[in-house]
Amino acid sequence: MIKVAKDKGGWMHPSFYELADYLGPYFDLSWCASDEQKAVEDRARFGGTDEEWTRRTLIFAYQNIALATQGIHRPYLARLLNVTEDKYGFRILDYGAGGGQTGIALHFMGYRVSFADIYGSSLIWLSYRLRALKLDLPIYAIDEPTLEIPHQNVAICFDVIEHLTPEVQRETLIRLGGLADLVFVNLVRDADETHKGVHQVLDFQELTDFVSSKWGCSAEDFYPDKEGKPRQRLLIYGNVSA
């Protein structure tokens, strides 16, 4: 393994060591999005469209790990475990998987996991990770709308919807509802201007009403800002009760 930079505390999350092996001499921990403003600065330096940034830049791999290891999704995964605690081997689709941090963790917890994302740098990085871990898990490139993905018990989709245009947001929510019996998806709304130009502005209630008009749906808010407004909302919906 190459010698890699450490963070200020002298410790680096193990997933970054995987990325260091993957990138070799191109590894640079300074690319890690240590705070929200850094993500915006990285995005601005790259230029191009959001889709091009997601598909092409190596920065995305650092930011994906940084965000996935901060524990933001813990309450969502706790609810997933509570729903599926007596159903070992449940089939779970990690949709918009990025580097697959959540899906890989769920695999080691006993779930039968598959991954789906657009074809780009993060999907290639995920393929490398699975090979390095000797995991034979399915990966689907969702660029083709007619792609047949086997029906799942649960689909999870975290930190994805805010990157999509309003039309594609609804298309994705519908597609997820057709892929699994139960869907867990979070909605992210930035409380300030930090992510302006990176995230779409989401209307939580409008999207909740949209999903509720088609499926049974529960909604729970998380991470209130200084004014008490939630920065995230978890939707659980589908054809079975959560």
Regions found by a protein language model. Name each.
Residues M1-P150, R170-L173, V198-A242:
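Conserved N-terminal segment of class I S-adenosyl-L-methionine
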Residues F90, N153, D181:
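Conserved acidic residues
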Residues I156:
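A conserved beta-strand element that flanks and buttresses the S-adenosyl-L-methionine
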Residues V160-H163:
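Hydrophobic adenine-recognition pocket in adenosine-nucleotide-binding enzymes
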Residues L176:
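Class I S-adenosylmethionine-dependent transferase superfamily signal
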Residues A180-D190:
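Conserved beta-strand signature within the Rossmann-like core of class I S-adenosyl-L-methionine
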Residues A191-K196:
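A short acidic, helix-capping loop that chelates divalent metal ions and anchors anionic groups
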